């Protein structure tokens, strides 16, 4: 009979002193997915918390689930706590979004688009423009809020001496575009 070997993953920290905790309002996996993060991106990011790949994969950050299953080894587990970095999660999520096919992106983005745009629109064209700029699907509605109603802006931002525009000519051009 062989004595089992136990391993322990390091705690995930909010910052250098505090653990990540749902009791303190920190996001759970389901909260992140509800906010528009892709499930695979969250899984990829969480896997990299407190673990790093070795060998030929040492510099790689984006993995498919099959790759993670293949290369994961307890040798890569760090002894120090891992700090949850929301900006890193956003960057990984943005990369996953960019790697989606246009059809996959449209399918995932449509519920967010439908919640923001209530006028007929070419969703395929819209998604082609959104995909390279999108980091989190949940931010799509605020990126599209101008489709149904022109938001109020400070008129001084429409003046441009070099292009000889005034607030009046800029407003005419914007209304013609919309």
Tell me what each language-model feature is:
Residues 1-97:
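Alpha-helical recognition segments enriched in aromatics with Gly/Pro capping
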Residues 102-178:
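Small-residue-rich helix-loop
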């Amino acid at each position: 009979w062989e004595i089992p070997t136990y391993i322990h993953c390091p705690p995930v920290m909010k910052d250098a002193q505090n653990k990540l905790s749902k009791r303190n309002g920190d996001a759970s996996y389901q909260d992140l997915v509800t906010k528009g993060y892709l499930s695979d991106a969250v899984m990829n990011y969480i896997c990299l918390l407190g673990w790093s790949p070795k060998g030929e994969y040492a510099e790689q950050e984006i993995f498919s689930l099959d790759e993670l299953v293949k290369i994961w080894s307890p040798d890569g587990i760090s002894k120090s706590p891992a700090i949850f970095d929301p900006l890193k999660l956003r960057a990984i999520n943005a990369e996953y979004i960019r790697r989606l096919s246009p059809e996959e992106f449209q399918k995932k983005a449509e519920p967010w688009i439908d919640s923001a745009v209530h006028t007929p629109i070419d969703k395929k064209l819209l998604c082609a423009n959104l995909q390279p700029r999108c980091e989190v699907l949940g931010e799509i509605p605020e990126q599209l809020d101008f489709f149904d109603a022109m938001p109020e802006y400070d008129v001084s931002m429409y003046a441009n001496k070099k292009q000889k525009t005034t607030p009046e000519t800029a407003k005419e051009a914007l209304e013609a575009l919309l």
